[in-house]
Amino acid sequence: MTDLHIVEASIAELRRALEAGTVTSVELVGACLRRIAHYDRHGIALNAVPLLNPKMFEEAGASDWRRRNGAALGPLDGIPYTAKDSYKVSGMTVAAGSPAFEHLIANEDAFTIGRLRAGGAVLI
């Protein structure tokens, strides 16, 4: 991977790096997970990302395949993002931090999540 600092990089910078082939979406997802692990799971243990998308690497790999084949879905294709756990993501819990809702599973995506997914963005 390049010397790109993903935490400080803008979406435009990440997109340019993806388009240039200096980084892949899979690598960006891995870098995000390392950053999350550093602050969320160890050290000061923020627990800011309580739920991870189990399909993130599959989605990132699909984005990389589309990019290699000239079929990117748009400027957000391959860009990792997070969403508050109160947003509905099909197949994932919508607990909003409440133990009372920890088993509530979304059966559809919220509008914003659906738009991001349609554009190829990768939910962490």
PLM region descriptions:
Residues 24-26, 45, 72, 79, ...:
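Loop/turn elements at helix/coil->beta-strand transitions in domains of secreted/extracellular proteins
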Residues 11, 38-43, 62, 67, ...:
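Enzymes and membrane/adaptor proteins characterized by extended Gly/Ser/Thr/Asp/Glu-rich
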Residues 1-59, 69:
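An N-terminal boundary/leader segment
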